[in-house]
Design a protein with these regions (language model features):
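A domain-level signal for the structural core that forms small-molecule/cofactor-binding pockets
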Residues: 1-66
């Protein structure tokens, strides 16, 4: 049973997450040549920008308004 872990900035709605999960699972199924959506788990991890750095840049400083 594959697990897809998605780490992203906080702020997506449940509906947006549902759409993301659907696209990811459908993409894996297409790429693998089949399978059942029910065999996948998608785990969303919401991360505050203040807790995410890319190199030396803190994301809350780099993207303060998004």
């Amino acid at each position: 049973m594959p697990i897809i872990r998605v780490e992203m900035f906080t702020g997506r709605s449940p509906e947006q997450k549902k759409n993301i999960a659907r696209e990811l699972v459908d993409g894996f199924i297409r790429g693998a040549g089949g399978g059942s959506p029910q065999s996948f788990n998608v785990v969303f991890v919401d991360v505050d920008k203040q807790d995410w750095a890319h190199g030396y840049d803190m994301m809350n400083e780099k993207y303060p308004d998004t």
